[in-house]
Amino acid sequence: NTDSIFDVQVKRLHEYKRQQLNALNIIAQYNYLKANPNADFVPKTYIFAAKAAPGYYMAKQIIKLIWNISQELKKDKKLNEKLNVIFLEDYNVSLSEILMPAANISEQISLAGTEASGTGNMKLMINGAITLGTLDGANVEIHEQVGDDNIIIFGMNVDEVNACKSGYKPMDIYNSNAVVKQAIDTLQYGINGQQFNEIADSLKNSDPYMALKDFDSYQKAQAYASECYKDQTKWQKMSLANIAGAGIFSADRSVEDYARDIWGLSK
């Protein structure tokens, strides 16, 4: 559906980058639309592209999950017009040159305090995508450049993550949040004929990157993004603010700073 929001998460597949949080939210949206087929739902196409390290079993399971979600959605044509998932194989620079200009939402959802920096969010920003993310890595600098109104921030900050770690019990969230419980149970019942018990068990029993803790906030951020997109004048202003604010991330500015501040050189 070319009229849908293109919600893009393209990066290395790792649990700290939390593609599993994105997938869990898609499952929750799928469950909602199955129960409410006539709901007023802004159509969304979730686009993933990622590679996992050869020996990283859980990352490969998450790729398998995303692909099976995409196949399950295709079984219901009416629902698939509202909710679609695409996993692009063999992600590389050439593919990113096509994908990044097409993105409406840039998913930068790592657990706060885990991302060193990264440049993918900057590339999406300069192409006009709106960042939906945590206060982690270069998202902090993007936030400083575009302001509160032109970025969608959710989840815990670093201090809140550190305060929560010692007593974190994801099973408590599973038992108290009906939407989370149904989504995780769906992993165990099966998606496109495949069960994902190991992902479900990890989320319920350890959840090392606190996907369940940030789930409610993430859902609200997604809902807010959909509401913003309905107002195309507002959305285009947000997009232009991101393009205009991206200049600080240019290589020229970075080299100038190094030459002046580190190497003591003048023009």
Regions found by a protein language model. Give the residues of each.
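Hydrophobic beta-strand segments of well-ordered beta-sheets in folded domains
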Residues: 44-46, 105, 131
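Catalytic binding pocket for nucleotide-activated donors in carbohydrate/polymer assembly enzymes
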Residues: 101-102, 109-239, 243-248, 253, ...
